[in-house]
């Protein structure tokens, strides 16, 4: 028989060994006991090869998906932990797990007056399923794609909606380069181990590249090695497996695919010279378990050195990041938001929100500010009021729609950059749509920065029936927030 103290010590050791091999070690206190027992432990057990009556990773999937799940190797047939140790580990976690989580602290809030909301309907149907959104500064148009494969552009000055493409798959990225118009299709929107995504290059005709991609959610098209030919860096988010991939054009005219990172969760990639050697490095956000920000340093021979710079708790639900010189010292700081809650641990989580990491040199970034916001998923960081500091506009796709739906969009007006003092402003625009995407730009050419929100009215998580009905009947696909700074 093990004593209580020795059993706890054994449990602590097992927790460190088995719960930090694939990602940062989470704090047991970060989830309530019922979610550990009903969701996390059964999933974790399956990944250790432990049979559990509460969870079968193959159940409910068609045979093709089952085959792909088995092929991934994520759920081994043979257990890697003895039954006695598994029981000790489970007992240890459930003993320490809290019954509930504390609520996020409330901050003083105001109604925002800096922006004037304007609804935009880009099609003839109610409801919205915008899967891609980006503002193009060169032609002053907003580009958006939906899950039905429709790509349109919108000119806010003339109110013109122009249909560009009609494809058959959900669009997750679009860009224009010397190669043509490049359209990225995700394949399966819902989590899947089956790769069905693709890239099409549109000129006079449509050419589909000969690569099947695993749920690509972003595609950076840029000439990285200064040979005048753009490369593509593709975030194949995947599911149980995935990758960060590089497509380079060969002398024969075709593309060659290289895997930069064999890991699921690639969400966004930015090209920026981070070490001052004149070459674009790749800064990448990884989600899906091992949540990190990575820098791929570009070498002279167009290879890359991997430098991990930030790692997050796997329960954070890391969703987005950007590089911003927040403190005005000439280098790039990292801003992140955490709040993806579309999984089997859905509760309001006090560690969701926005974090500011200041660049201290030599690839060291230190967290200096945290703004709590349940379900925070994306943001834009600009000087919206033109007072020489960085303000933030944040969307939450997973707010507490039952009690605080107005927190689906939050504007943080910077009052003191050094001390991180912000005026929190909200507006109840949640009835118009479920905000999934955000971008900004001077849409009306009046000299200030406006904001655009893209709606995706699918119900990922619990939402009041009256709000669902409003979304289904709404004709708001995009919501323009016109900055009122310049009349």
Label for each model-derived stretch:
Residues 5-13, 17-487:
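Beta-propeller-forming repeat regions
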């Amino acid at each position: 028989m093990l004593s209580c103290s020795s059993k706890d010590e054994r449990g602590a050791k097992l927790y460190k060994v088995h719960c930090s091999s694939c990602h940062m070690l989470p704090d047991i206190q970060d989830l309530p006991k019922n979610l550990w027992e009903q969701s996390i432990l059964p999933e974790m057990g399956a990944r250790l090869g432990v049979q559990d009556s509460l969870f079968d990773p193959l159940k409910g999937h068609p045979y093709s998906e089952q085959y792909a799940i088995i092929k991934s190797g994520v759920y081994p047939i043979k257990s890697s932990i003895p039954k006695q140790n598994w029981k000790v580990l489970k007992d240890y976690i459930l003993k320490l797990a809290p019954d509930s989580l504390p609520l996020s602290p409330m901050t003083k809030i105001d109604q925002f007056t800096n922006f004037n909301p304007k609804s935009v309907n880009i099609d003839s149907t109610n409801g919205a399923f915008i899967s891609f959104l980006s503002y193009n500064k060169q032609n002053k148009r907003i580009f958006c794609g939906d899950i039905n494969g429709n790509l349109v552009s919108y000119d806010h000055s003339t109110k013109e909606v122009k249909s560009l493409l009609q494809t058959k798959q959900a669009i997750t990225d679009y860009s224009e380069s010397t190669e043509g118009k490049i359209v990225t299709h995700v394949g399966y929107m819902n989590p899947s181990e089956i790769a069905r995504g693709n890239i099409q290059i549109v000129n006079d005709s449509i050419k589909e590249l000969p690569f099947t991609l695993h749920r690509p959610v972003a595609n950076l098209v840029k000439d990285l090695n200064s040979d005048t030919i753009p490369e593509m860096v593709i975030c194949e988010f995947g599911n149980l497996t995935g990758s960060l991939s590089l497509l380079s054009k060969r002398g024969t005219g075709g593309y060659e695919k290289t895997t930069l990172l064999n890991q699921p969760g690639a969400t966004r990639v930015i090209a920026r010279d981070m070490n001052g050697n004149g070459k674009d490095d790749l800064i990448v956000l990884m989600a899906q378990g091992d949540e990190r920000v990575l820098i791929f340093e570009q070498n002279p021979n167009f290879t890359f050195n991997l430098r991990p710079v930030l790692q997050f708790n796997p329960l954070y639900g890391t969703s987005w990041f950007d590089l911003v010189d927040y403190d005005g010292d000439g280098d790039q700081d990292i801003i992140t938001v955490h709040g993806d809650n579309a999984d089997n641990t859905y509760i309001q989580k006090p560690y969701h929100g926005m974090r500011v990491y200041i660049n201290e040199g030599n690839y060291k970034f230190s967290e200096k500010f945290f703004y709590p916001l349940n379900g925070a998923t994306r943001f834009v960081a600009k000087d919206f009021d033109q007072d020489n500091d960085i303000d933030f506009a944040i969307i939450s796709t997973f707010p507490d729609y039952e009690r605080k739906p107005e927190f689906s969009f939050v504007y943080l007006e910077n009052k003191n950059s050094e001390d991180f003092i912000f005026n929190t402003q909200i507006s109840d625009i949640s009835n118009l749509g479920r905000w999934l995407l955000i971008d900004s730009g001077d849409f009306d050419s009046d000299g200030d920065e406006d904001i655009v929100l893209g709606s995706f009215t699918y119900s990922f998580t619990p939402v009041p029936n009256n709000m669902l009905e409003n979304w289904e009947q709404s004709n708001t696909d995009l919501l323009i927030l016109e900055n009122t700074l310049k009349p």
